[in-house]
Amino acid sequence: MCIRDPISGIGGMNHFLLPGRGPGGERSGRYGDVAVPLLVARLLALGAARNDLRAKVFGGGHVLSTVPAGGRTLGADNVQMAMSALRDEGVRLVSEDVGGTRGRKLAFNTVDGTALVWRL
């Protein structure tokens, strides 16, 4: 996920592995329910304005050869968490490249807000 305030030019990105930490879980950026609010808080602390924040979401691909019982994949759960967390934080989504069966490599230019994606 890339988030940037185009007015101030302040931006950053995160990558989380799991959607949520569960009851009593450690507060770590590897979880989406922690990583997204942490990134937004850091951008605001650096001078970004919440109303100006724009997000781009990438990933959520199902890169394993098996589908879990019930058909829900970790990638789909991560995408759902990302979208939900952005709504909760009041951050507008401007683009997404999610799902599929391949991983992604991402480069984010915080100066102009461009994001380059390579499918692996």
Residue map of PLM features:
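Electropositive, glycine- and tryptophan-enriched low-complexity nucleic-acid-binding patches
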Residues: 9-13
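Phosphate/ribose-phosphate-bearing ligand recognition and processing surfaces
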Residues: 62-76
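Short, well-ordered amphipathic alpha-helical segments that serve as non-catalytic structural scaffolds
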Residues: 30-46
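Divalent-metal-activated hydrolytic enzyme cores
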Residues: 75-120
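Conserved small/polar residues in nucleotide/adenosyl-binding loops
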Residues: 1-5
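Short glycine-rich phosphate-binding loop at a beta-alpha junction
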Residues: 51-59
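Short histidine-centered catalytic/ligand-binding loop motif
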Residues: 20-29
